[in-house]
Every structure is written in structure tokens, then in C-alpha cells.
Amino acid sequence: KIDDHTVQVQWSADVSPALALNILSTPIASIVDEKLVAPNAKNNDFGNEWLKMHSAGSGAFKMRTYQPHQAIVMEANASSPTGAPKLKSVIIKNVPDPATRRLLLQQGDADMARDLGADQIDALQGKPGVKVMSIASAEQNYLAFNTGNKDNPLMSNPAFWEAARWLVDYDGITKNLLKGQYFTHQSFLPVGFPGALEETPFTFNPAKAKEILAKAGIKDPHFTLDVENKPPFITIAQSIQASFAQGGVKVDLLPAAGSQVYSRVRAHQHQGAIRMWLPDYFDAHSNASSFAYNDGKSSTVAGLNGWKIPELNKETLAAIAEPDSAKRLDLYKKMQQELQRSSPYVFIDQGKTQIV
């Protein structure tokens, strides 16, 4: 403690100050009133169990009532360092059915609703007093090839990876099938993250893909594709099956429950798989440490797909330790370009959080 409003944080790991601060900005590092929480600690849990049902933070609102899986009532925190908000209270209700959420909104019983889905939002477009906001989320969908699959050597062929980038109908998926709930994004850092590449160099071009395959001497290409049997994953997979066929690539879908797909990927039993990614914290390393790092021990995305990348490992470790913020972002931009140029991933789209 430096003074009543300043603390000094030190760490032993060789990581940049930016990463440390970004991790501290996540919910796991929330600041709470020690004098209030400490007496309620049990079994060395630092008051964690008590905090599940009580409020002791410094944010704009504090929890007044919490009913798990039903509702939470928050009231303005007059002692917040930023001052009390204009709203005196906020009620957040869990309403599982999207149609019911839409009805509550239309009747004026709710001021805001989230996760309504494309059909419900379409029904609300243009209605008086209704505004739809779309905000980029960090959710990304991608196609991954298991380079360690012994049954299909095509999965480890860089020429096939390159061709695959030109066989995804990005616009058809995002604009038509997913109705604007996602947008095309083709790098491992999502839009909104510092250092994210927002360029989309790849388009649906089966003729170009055929040229790449022919030049590499690849004949009758085919692979199986593991996918969760629910939207948006199965929707994306069906589009890929159709668009890859136009490039002469046969794709056999293996739809299953999410737990089954996850188990097969963890066991390295897949050839191709449609997967979703969400970062753990707001820093480039959260994604780079999984897509561009494989130490052979941890279950990173690169590791799960058998991609051995000793040089990229070094680049990832160098980026996490770089103290200069501008230089650090440049390192991540170069890594994204490397993965766009050659990697067993095809980054397809990024999600939108739609609020009505």
C-alpha cells in the first residue's frame, strides 16, 4: 500500500506490465472492502463463499438481492469512487425463453433484452420505441485441422490449409445464414483487442483453391468434420460442406453433442473440427498462448491439433515479456500475419452481442 488510493503490485514472472494490468482488470481481481469481507472468510477462502450472496465492492452498483438463476437487484453505490450513478436501482431477470423476453420488451415490462436471436430481433426491427444495438463480442468461430491425424495426411499439408482459406463462403455464412449476428473476421485476435488485424484478405474463390490444390499435386481431397449439432456450428459446417465441394473437396460431417465433440478433439481423434473460442482476459496473450503456442504439455488449441511450432513458441514468449506496449502490439500483428499465411486454422467469423 502506497496510500489510501494507491497500491504497488509486484510479480516474479517475466511478463509485461500491460499483461499484468489486463489480468488485474478481470473479475478475478475485483477490489473489495477487506474489513467487511475478512470476518466472513471460511477455510481460507478469502470470503469467496460469502461474496456470492453479498456485496463489498467499489463499483457503481452494489448487490441488494440475489436469487440464483432467477434475478439480481442492484442499487446505486453512493460511496463509489466514481460517484453514485443516476439510476437508483437495476433489476436483472433470467428469462430463458427468447420469445418471452421479446414480449416483456414490447409490453414495456423490460427496458433491455439480450440474446433474443435472429428471428426475434427481425420481428422487432422498425417497431416504435425499439432500438437494436450490435456490439462486437470476443467470440470467434474457426475451422481447425488436426495435423497429427495419421489417417489423413492432408490435415498436415500447408497447401491444403491455404486452399481451405479460399473455400469458405464467409459472406454467405455471416450475412445470410447467421443473419448478421456474426461478421467476417480472419485473425486470431478479435476486433476490439489491441493489435487485432481487421483486414479480411480471403474471399470465397473455389477456382483459386483448385489451382493451389493442383499445384501441390493434391487429388481427391477429403476429410471428416466434427461439429456440435446446434447453431451456429452446424450451420457453418453445412455451408463449409457445400462450398468446399465447389473446390473439389469432399467433407463428411460428424455432428454430435458438444461434450462428444470436445472429447474427440481432446483425444486428438478428429480430422477437422468447427470450434468456438472466447479469451479468458482482455489481452492478446490469452489467444496467442493457445493458437500460437504448443509446449507439448498443455491443451492449447495448437496442441490439440498437433501443430508443432518451436519458432512461434519463441515469438509468443517474447511478446508476453516485451515491456514496450507499441513493440508488443507489433509482435502480435506479425504473429497474426504468420498464422494467416500458414496455419491449420481458418478463422471464419466473430460474434456480435445484440442488445434491444
Model-predicted regions and their roles:
Residues 7-9, 82-93, 219-225, 242-256, ...:
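A local structural motif
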Residues 25-85, 89, 206-207, 211:
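Gly/Pro-rich hinge or "lid" segments in bacterial periplasmic/extracellular proteins
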Residues 61, 158, 183-215, 232-235:
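Structural transition elements
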Residues 99-109, 126-127, 159, 238-247, ...:
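Short helices/loops that flank or line small-molecule/ion binding pockets
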